[in-house]
Amino acid sequence: MIIKDVEFIKSATKPSEYTEPLFLEVAFAGRSNVGKSSLINTLINRKSLVKTSSKPGCTQLINFFLLNGNLSLVDLPGYGYAKVSKKIRAQWGPMIERYLTVRETLRAIVLLIDMRREPQREELDLINWFTAHAIPYRIVLTKADKLSKTKQQKNISAIAKGLGMEQDRLIAFSSKTRLGRDRLWQELDTMLNP
């Protein structure tokens, strides 16, 4: 995809604060510090439009970005970070589920999993939830540059087995080397233009 224009639109916590549902949307979900913001910056060829942090739990709101005036990218809060207050953690689950449930322009979800880690219960629950609600999704394995090629293949195989799916359904990704960027755009294009 040729990126001509990208802009941050707004942050939200509830449906009344969401952007008007005028454009197709792709949402990005995953654990805290899995690299959602870095992945979005890599996809849109920007270094810092989406705020990144080495501290988990930085994204605490649903952030909407408009790409080329016709596609909305949505950065969801990360889940699973214990050092965020219990009150905030308790709000994230319902906030994300509400967005995923009511957003009629949502066309695809990109679920990010750190390639160095085994999938956790939350990832399996999300995949089951996406499937039950007939929401198309892709799984991206982030931080591939942190592993050797041999270790990447070993981990891809283990993660695919843990998720009960074929390896070719997983996209290895690195924001540092841009590995997987073109493939992810191809997959998104297929989902957005069936």
From Swiss-Prot:
GO cellular component, one term: cytosol
PANTHER family: ENGB-TYPE G DOMAIN-CONTAINING PROTEIN, MSS1/TRME-RELATED GTP-BINDING PROTEIN
GO MF, any single term: metal ion binding
Keyword Nucleotide-binding: yes
Source organism: Desulforapulum autotrophicum (strain ATCC 43914 / DSM 3382 / VKM B-1955 / HRM2)
Cofactor field: Mg(2+)
Family stated for the protein in its record: Belongs to the TRAFAC class TrmE-Era-EngA-EngB-Septin-like GTPase superfamily. EngB GTPase family.
Pfam name, any one: MMR_HSR1
Binding-site positions, GTP: 30-37, 57-61, 75-78, 142-145, 173-175
Gene Ontology BP annotations: division septum assembly
Listed name of the protein: Probable GTP-binding protein EngB
Keywords for the protein's UniProt record, in alphabetical order: Cell cycle, Cell division, GTP-binding, Magnesium, Metal-binding, Nucleotide-binding, Septation
Role this protein plays: Necessary for normal cell division and for the maintenance of normal septation.
PROSITE patterns, sorted: G_ENGB
Ligand binding (Mg(2+)): 37, 59
Domain EngB-type G: 22-194
Lineage: Bacteria, Pseudomonadati, Thermodesulfobacteriota, Desulfobacteria, Desulfobacterales
Classification via InterPro entries: G_ENGB_dom, GTP-bd, GTP-bd_ribosome_bio_YsxC, P-loop_NTPase, Small_GTP-bd
Stored Gene3D superfamilies: P-loop containing nucleotide triphosphate hydrolases
